Amino acid sequence: MSSFAALNLSTNENADESKDHSRELQVEESSKIFQLALIQLKAKRFDDAKETFDRLFEIDVIKPNKWGLYEYSSPTLDSLRYLAYRNRGILHYQYAKENFKQMESDDVVEHILKTLECLLESLQHGEADNTVTHLLLKIFWSFNSTKLSRTILEYELTRSPEEIRLLSSLSAMFKDQKRVFKQYSQLLKKLHVTSLPQNIPTAVEAVLNCIETCDVEEGQIEPLLKDIKAMKTEDDEILKELDGSNLNLNELSWEELGVSLRSLVPKTKVVNILGRKSDTYSDLEAPIEYVSFTTDEFMEKLSDSSNESPGHSPEHFEDAVSVMPETNNIEVSVEREPSAKRQDSTDRPAQRSSKRFKEREKVQEPDVEQQVEFHTYIINEINQSLHVSGIEKDISIEELDPNNVAKRQELCMSDFYDCLTSWTNKHTEFLKQGQENFSVKGSTDDFTQLTMLLRSSMFSGDVEPTDSLSEIEAEDVRRFIRDVNDKKLHFHAVRFLFIKELLKLREDGTCLVTDYFWSPALYEVVEFFSMAIEVNLYQMIEPSTDESTVSIAVSIFEIMTNMMGNICNDLANKKAQGQKYNELESQRNKLQRKIVRWYEMLLSKPLSTKLKFRFQWSHFSCLQCTTDVTNSTLITTIEDIENSLKEFPDFGTVAYSNYNNISSLSLKTVQSQFSKIKMLRRFTIVDIENEDEDNTHKDYIEHLYCILNQIPCEGTDFQSLLSFVNTSPFLMKLKLWKLLLNYFASRKDQLRFQNCFFSSIKFLLARLSSEEYQIQSQLQRQQTLLSTLTHIGEFSKRFFQVLCDNWDMSLKNPSRDQLQVLVSIFRLLYPLVFYETLTEKNASLKSFFKKAVKSSITIQDIFLTVASLMILCHKFITLEKENAKEEFTGSIIDLISALHMLAGKFEFCDRFDGNFLKVQEKLLCEFSNDSAFTHLKRELWCRYHISIGLDNPEDQHQTHAQPMVKANAIMLSNYFIKFQYQDRNILVLSNNRSNFKQFFETVMELIGDIDYEANHVLSRNEYFFNQYFTAPITLKTIRDAYAGEFEIEFTSPNDDLQSGVDGGLFYVSAVHALNQYKARKKSMQARPSELDAIISTLTTDILYNTKRFESWYLLGKCYSFVVEDDLTWTSDKLASRDKKQATAFAEKKAILCYLMALSLYLSTFKETTSEQMKNDNKIVFRNLLESLGKEMLQAYVKPMSSMSYTWKLKPVLVLKADGSLENLPISYKPSISETNILRCILMILAKADTLYNKDEERNWMNPFYISKVHFKTDRKLFKESGICLLQDSCRLALLQSSVSGSDNILEAHYALVSYCYKCFKDRTFSLAEAISHLREDNGFFGLPEEEWQVEDDKSFFNLIIRLLKYILSKDKQKWQHRPIYRIAQIKYTEFEDTDGAMKEMNKLLALKSVNKNVVNIWKPENELPGKHFVYAYQYVLFYMDLLNEKHDFMAIGGMVKKLRRFGSGMINSQDAINKAVELFVNGAKVKLSLNEKEHGELLMQRIPFPEFVELSEELFNAFKKGDYQSDVLDVFLLAYNLKKGTNSIQFDGVCITIYFKYFYCPFVENKKQSTPYPAPIIEGISGPQPENSPSQQLPQSQSQPQLPRSPSPNTANNKEKTAKTPVKNPTSIRKRVSKRDVFDRVVKLIEKRLS
């Protein structure tokens, strides 16, 4: 049950008394703390006082609760709280007063505010004294707060009215009181107060009347308060200032103004301001009370100079025309002048350079003449190449020089130079006008595309060339800035004024937004501001009838109409793509309501003619967006506009160049739009009526094709369509061309697609030579030129893209006229690069590539697109000719080289998304000659930054590397393989280029790992491939392979890698990788894991069904290297049959790979046509046979011992007699007999030996291994033919050693000596025959004739030893070990010279070395892998026999220790250890006469355990090492160490026997002789005593108790003595001494006394 009881419900009086008492104690404690705080404050220990006050306010009776209320109140507590807060406030004030000079201003203010807080809080608990009121009055004075000062003064005056009455006489007042009255009087005057408040006593009023004329001494103001007052005054001044924004303008333009103003408000999309919260200005945290603009002084001067007359700035005019043609037309020259004054793409002025800097630039000026020579060379190369295609008209430097261009004939080129010279933002916008999406979105149906095209073209028309706003804006902008800065207008006012200036109708009848070309950024700002304050603008304009104001309404209506077009277009696109469009519909509805409201307002306004037409035309444009073409209102509206415009023939044109969805307004454009609507209505009706028929649609496309290509045609609606096209504006015709190109591209009609492209390009070029172009102003011509170039680029890119996607960059029967069109465009674009050369010549010209980076990239792309098409067109025209094909091929390569050098010179050859380099790569890979390869290397660097032996650094152009795609990688790899290894086998060539190796590694890394499971054909092939290696090696397998009938039924996957694999990509990559592995292996740096990637690569080549026998051969070599590595470095994998399985399987794989390679070669060698390739393949085939024969021999001999020729039986379950099932043990059966293995080896090696054309080229190993097999299998056959083959091998080895100059080949010579010795021993050879065979190799030995005269066996053996030593003397690397062993074996066997044999064997074995090696031999280069482990085992056994012969069992014991650590250095290490242990134990037993049964087992049975423990302990205590023979101790210690190393029981007998025989028993006997009591006598253990027996040295006085022992069956006396022995507890069972007990004593004795 809870023990809680609410206090307010408790009736316990004791509890209330306890609370009261506790509260009283807290009050007392608070008083003490308060007094301490006062003392510290008085002593100015501010920090201590602060801490004390903090403690005070932590007491419950002082601090309020969380709501600021006090639970208990009393006069004492109120007084205490008042004093606490009062003095705490004074503490903060005093601290600030003393330290304000060292404090930050923020800290000073913080302390003053805390002072106010505490003092004001004190007033809540008591009446303030004079100190508090005067301090508050001073602080409020420093705050400049009259209201707070008046409050405190009135508080002071009304605090004690009686005191004021008593002190009504001024003479009776204190100075402070007079000062209060004086301040209050002055304050009332300042506030213009005539009557006092009602709470002021009348006595105060009397004093105030007197105080006005009385002089009162002013109190001194403390410095702290003066500082506070100054800060407050400064803050007040700052607050009075307007919160404005100063915008720094980088240029005098409306765009800069608009973007700067836009940056002041939060950014959002224009469509997002269509809702209720339209103006983002409301999201600002603080208002913008005024806006001001600042401009750069230098920019002002530049703008001022731009308004000067041409005569006032001759240097600008000179700069402008320095690259312009001379002309007699003054108007044109004047027009060009302002454009030259424009700066870079951002329209920023260039900084001035110092004279010293200019001089430095002049010194480093490039060789311009050399640059001109470069252009001359390039143009000559291009002309010569084009002559082959029949292009007679040359391009010349003279016509490209701007000073030589004829005005009328090459006006477009002259205009192009003008643009490059004076490029500004407006030129960038001109260039962007031609950029639009080429493809038509929507249905793939062709007729529907045509309908959509007509419908989309209704929203826009031709972009009429118009003057740029930047040409006239400087003075207007300057005036605008001046007005804003002078008047300090609010942001709203500045924004409205900005909109008004740009949207209103000017005095000259123009409107900036419709009649001048703007940048998109400026239009976006105007659109954003207009829609943001649309409601305010409507309210302002709606009651007005002023034309200027109403014109703003028309402009805003046009802006909303254009926005409606954008929304409707996005809505249509999203519907066509199946995306969500709910938000767009909502935006459209909101905007529609605004448009309707403005439309109704404008209908009621009186409009001038131009405004009326603008309003009607924008209304018509809005109808086009929002209604269907069948809407009658649409037709009525445009008919009314057309009829009205006919009444005003001088109306002119409203350009609308800034609107995407409002076309230009003129009678011509109205009629064009009307025509489009009529045509669209016709198509719509046809589409409805012929919903299921397609013929009509095709007819319209066919008619359109004939009309645009000017081909005669007839048919329904042909004339109407012809009329429509002829009257269509330029952009409409352009869209029709795009429609046709898309149509024929989708139909893959290459011929018509190609014809349409070249016809459309001619159409675009004709625009630049038209009369209309000639009569335009310079700026208009520049606009037309740049937009036309963009259109040419878009058409060319589309044409190139379709060629790549559909027809692999191939043209269909291109004509010379078509090539001439491309050459004309190229010639027009050549000023792009020629101008860069001129900039290096003339310092006043700035590089176009540097001043307009983005625009230059666009034109560079066009340049490279045209150049790429030129190359392709020239290639297909030249290759049509049958004669002089090599010359034509050279012209193609020369053209590629010239164009690449040109683009690379100016560092843009990688533009056009790398397609220019892609074209070169594609074409150059078709020509397998040195010239093509040279240029291809340069292309590879520029495109991928892959360097393949680039000799000239200038060929390494500054480009950005592109990632290589798989298709290009395969194409290039096939080319390089074909180019480098033409009609040759790569395995035969000795000089493989390392440059290609890097390339192939890059390609293989790009391709990556192949997922066989992703392709069912590869999965199938992989399964058969793996199954092949599980089959055993049988005689039938070898026969089928040798007959060429052995194969695996692979299928080609024919995927994207097939061509690359067939071309040899994976095969060549594997060859390079394997060569690298061999080189690393030779220097012992290779790792077998490196072979995994090579095996995987070769496996891929095989699985793709290439039927390349070399791949199988190399795969076998890889597995051979794996086996060699397993058998060379360590014998761990040879320790048991299970461990050898992995190596045997790899060896089996190698043999099977060789057999498959053999079969493939024999079945396909007749298909090779080239004699050179046949000879190369024959050499590879010979190497294959040698590898196969060697591998089969290696698998047959030790240490593998034919494991690869076995097969594992499947598990078998046997039913036993008791009915249970039993698994038979797994067994291995030979898959081929040993006889057949050896026959196959002999046949293969013999066949390989016959394939050598010259005798000196023969491989010495072939006859060597054949003779070796004969020697091992049949000595008779060896005598007949084997010895001759061996002598042949010695001759070849000697010849090849002298030719190569490397280490001598000694294996054959040793084999000859060894085999002759063995054959003489087994009587195969007689002495004379053996000498005769040895003399055949005297060319190597070089012995004089008399040394060959041997008459007896001993002399023959000495001759053998001399020959073996001579072989060792020729061993430079000292790796030959077999002759040493043979010498030792002959000395031991024939001469019984054990010491001499051991001396020889000590050269091979190192028992006393500190390392773990026992046998110091290594595998010679020509020795079969793994044989050195066999030989090491043989040498160890032979050495142990020699030691045993010398009875050196201690050395044998030492061998045991080393053999345990040398286990990985030979085979059968455990057998060797067991033999060494056996020899050591037997030797120790013989040497020390040890009998384990007598001195071990029987003795342990007879000794009582207590006696053994007691005596063993005494023996341990009395043991001295010098009392025993050293040989006994050495054997004892060695046996223990050997036992300790293996924990084996083999050494237990030796250790225990020595312990009892030489230590324990003599100690007991000595004990028996020295004691007066009967000592235990143990029968039959008295062995031979050492001379210094410990029994002679035991003290005589030592007593020895009699030990119980077992009765001896041999003597009766022992029985009597035993009967007299006292026995304790005879009924107990006696514990016997075990081996473990004895060995514990042995361990203790050795480790404590001997170690």
UniProtKB/Swiss-Prot annotation:
Signal peptide residue numbers: none
GO molecular function annotation: nucleosome binding
UniProt region (Disordered), positions on chain: 1-22, 333-368, 1575-1632
Any one Gene Ontology cellular component term annotated for this protein: nucleus
Keyword tRNA-binding: no
Keywords for this protein: Chromosome partition, Nucleus, Repeat, TPR repeat, Transcription, Transcription regulation
Keyword Transcription regulation: yes
Biased composition (Polar residues): 1-13
Subcellular location: Nucleus
Stretches forming TPR repeats: 30-63
GO biological process, one term: chromosome segregation
Composition bias type Basic and acidic residues, residue spans: 333-365
InterPro entries (alphabetical): Hir3/CABIN1
Bias (Low complexity): 1589-1609
Family to which the UniProt record says this protein belongs: Belongs to the HIR3 family.
PANTHER family, A to Z: CALCINEURIN-BINDING PROTEIN CABIN 1-RELATED, CALCINEURIN-BINDING PROTEIN CABIN-1
The protein's role, per its UniProt record: Has a role in a nucleosome assembly pathway that is required for the integrity of heterochromatin and proper chromosome segregation.
Name this polypeptide is given: Histone transcription regulator 3 homolog
